[in-house]
């Protein structure tokens, strides 16, 4: 468990958007895709995930990792089939965004949605790299409460609004990770795809870069930190993160 504590501590979490949505007509959207992670809580009506026959009740949640396409049905009854491109072009015909905080969770055929980034050392998309599919979370009161609070803050202009939203978005990420671990979900994927996050040499490199800007960050110095050869350090870093170390430093 200590390994996952280190991973969570390394995560850079950024809030992207919050939406309180009323479903205007029943639709089935093919290949819904977003680079950001999305968590949705159903308030009233129906949401279905293609390939998953689980019955979803009000209060249940759906998590979609960034970069994972999903076919989703919103609303009850026979849906209209549309592409994601058509949905984005005519979004206002299908969804109504609501901004009155007193209506959150009180409107028929509605849901709340939060989108966010979660990157290990601000470089690697954590949930994307785990290669896990979208999944439902049954009646998780804490996650539901966090989403409600973020939606409420997002509708306000109170002092400290941004700070509250950032803190609660970080809590959402932690609760999702805890849910996955507690329920032993995706055990094989976690064992395979989280290994490199636990590599102490990689953690040493990330920590050194973070603490040494704008000092000596040459490959030679990074190799000394990780105790690998200068010729190998670039290949090693890219193999584990998908990016060259100097590109990461510039980013």
Predicted regions mapped to residue ranges:
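Exposed alpha-helical structural elements
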Residues: 3-7, 17, 125, 142
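A short, mixed-charge helix-start or loop-turn motif at secondary-structure junctions
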Residues: 105, 154-158, 191, 219, ...
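An amphipathic alpha-helical interaction segment
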Residues: 110-193, 197-207, 232-234
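Short alpha-helical hairpin
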Residues: 13-17, 147
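N-terminal regulatory/effector-sensing and dimerization cores
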Residues: 17-127, 156-159
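A short, N-terminal "cap"/entry segment at the start of jelly-roll beta-barrel domains
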Residues: 1-12, 133-138
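Basic/polar phosphate-binding segments, predominantly the helix-turn-helix DNA-binding elements
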Residues: 175-181, 204, 208-251
């Amino acid at each position: 468990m200590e390994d996952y504590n280190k991973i969570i501590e390394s995560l850079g979490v950024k809030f992207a958007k919050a939406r309180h949505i009323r479903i205007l007509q029943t639709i089935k959207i093919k290949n819904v895709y977003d680079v950001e992670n999305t968590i949705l809580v159903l308030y009233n009506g129906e949401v279905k995930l293609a390939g998953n026959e689980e019955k979803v009740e009000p209060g249940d949640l759906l998590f979609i990792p960034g970069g994972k396409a999903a076919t989703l049905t919103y609303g009850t009854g026979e849906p209209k089939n549309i592409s994601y491109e058509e949905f984005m072009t005519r979004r206002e015909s299908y969804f109504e965004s609501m901004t009155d905080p007193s209506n959150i969770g009180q409107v028929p055929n509605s849901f709340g949605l939060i989108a966010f980034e979660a990157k290990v050392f601000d470089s690697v998309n954590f949930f994307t790299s785990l290669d896990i599919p979208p999944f439902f979370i049954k009646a998780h009161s804490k996650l539901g409460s966090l989403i409600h609070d973020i939606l409420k803050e997002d509708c306000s202009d109170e002092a400290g609004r941004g700070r509250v939203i950032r803190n609660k978005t970080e809590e959402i990420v932690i609760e999702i990770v805890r849910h996955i671990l507690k329920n032993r979900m995706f055990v094989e994927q976690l064992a395979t795809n989280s290994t490199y996050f636990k590599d102490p040499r990689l953690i040493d490199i990330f920590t050194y870069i973070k603490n040494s800007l704008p000092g000596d960050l040459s490959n030679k110095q990074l190799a000394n930190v990780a105790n690998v050869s200068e010729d190998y350090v670039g290949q090693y870093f890219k193999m584990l993160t998908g990016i060259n170390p100097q590109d990461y430093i510039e980013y």
